[in-house]
Amino acid sequence: MQRSIKIETHFLRPQYKIEEKIKERGDEQQRTTNVHADVTNWHLQLDDTYKSITGHIHENYPQHTIKELWGCTYRKGDFTQAHNHYGFDRAFVWFVDTSSTCSPLIFPDPEHPWMPDIHVITPQNGLLVVFGGCELHYVPPHVNNYERVVMSGNMRLNT
């Protein structure tokens, strides 16, 4: 029997030009992470530019603290290797500027790899997806010319 994953979704309209701010930062990680795309530094939660997402997270998950927040810009051929966010209670992806033809966020079933993926999240501007930090996920190679801009983050339970 295929296992289930608890995924919570919210909608938060991206504020004006937030995608430009992410793109302006460029690839601060120099493609050294699981994300083979342009990735900003890990600490955008400290920048008021991104207070719409941090405020939304704090309002909806008051028992958690955002420990890391970063932006990603995927171009044709970019992808993210399968990984999880071990050591964090929750992780999230916020689709800032995408189209439904952009590569999805996929949650495979590592216990039953012959089974269909557990969840395939089609990008939609403003969609915020929150999931357990231990859940395996990936993004297949981006196949079109529309830049896929997202913000991702990690949260820990307050102690």
Which residues does each PLM region occupy?
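Catalytic core of non-heme Fe(II) oxygenases with the double-stranded beta-helix
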Residues: 65-141, 146-150, 158
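Non-heme Fe(II)/2-oxoglutarate
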Residues: 1-63, 69-72, 79-80
